[in-house]
Amino acid sequence: MELVRSFTSASFIHQGGEACIYKVQGESSRTYSFKWYNAGVSYDASVIEKLQKLNVPGVCRILESGAVEGRPYIVYDYVDGVSSKELSPMPLGVALHSLRKIVAALQALRGAGISHGDINPSNVFFDRSASPVLMDFGIVGPGALHYSAPERFSGAAPSEKSDLFSLGALLYFWVAGEPLLEGETFEQIRGAMENLGPEKIGLSLLEKIQAKKVSLSPEDLSLLEPLWKGLLEPSPDARLEDLEELDELLEIALEKHGGVGVQLARALENFGQRISEILQKNETKTLEKADLPFLNSGKRSKKGKKGFYFGACLFILIVLALVALVFFGRSETSVDETGALLMQKTRDSQMQAAPDSVEMPNLEGVLERLKPEEGE
């Protein structure tokens, strides 16, 4: 919980059904993303523990996890980028090239025994270099319904096969600018899944071409068809074998579209410029400040320490003042009282073993002279 206790400020970014996400600043002025789950929500801690040990290119690092104020949380790197949800539709070459990068990141995760489980446009960010970064993981539920594999609706755990389906739905959104599956409820989306097929997907894209909503050619529709067949099958067994096979299909499709030459380089440059423009616009927006309860804990402790030190100093000053008053403030003490006090001190001193070189004074004569004469 070291990072959480070091947060000095927070700004609200997004509220979902399971958690709120904040942009937070640490004591070292470093920026983090803080995902604070709602009360009663729990996640798969074993997946988070594995992810904290990994540093995979193209995957946002998880730095800390735990619970604060009775609610689970995750701290991860803040990605200065734009959600792919804001960047669709995108050029087909950019979409195919970017999906290959995501597949490479997912393959690295599979090597550690991890499936993503919640691949959707909002969980893929593009940084300033136009490189995709995978965010978040499906550690709570089936993930975004429009991008979840049918078996996830039945409670199946995330797997390589379910990630393949989600990648197909993601690719469709990237090139079409709209979700493949229509519907607002669980039943509606599940019903749309049962009617999926490469032909229907192709017709859907053709309608968008005719409506001039997307810039695709008939050749583009043809090179995409094997991907729809391999990814968007309702049955896991009918999908591609694994991520490696998907990467091969993406490479073939990219070559048919023009390869990784000048055309793709120009498209990526324009895409990066688009990202920069959105980020510049976002910089002018002021995020809503969030007063997270534990942000003040450090401040309160510092204030508490300052108050303690102030109180201690004040107490010492009062004690010193009282001592000074006792020993130096008895200006109205009577002569008799003064004499008695001096006499008592003299007797006390004489009873102590004093050094031979010191002669103790006899104050009796002085005291006799200090006594007032009768009648005064």
Specify the residue positions occupied by each region the protein language model found.
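Conserved catalytic-loop aspartate of Hanks-type protein kinases
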Residues: 163
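Regulatory extensions appended to serine/threonine kinase catalytic cores
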Residues: 257-304
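ATP-binding glycine-rich loop module of kinase domains
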Residues: 20, 26-42
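Activation segment signature within eukaryotic-like protein kinase domains
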Residues: 98-99
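Activation-segment/catalytic-loop signature of the eukaryotic protein kinase fold
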Residues: 65
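Protein kinase catalytic-loop region centered on the HRD/HxD motif
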Residues: 104-114
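Conserved short submotifs of the Hanks-type protein kinase catalytic core
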Residues: 69-82
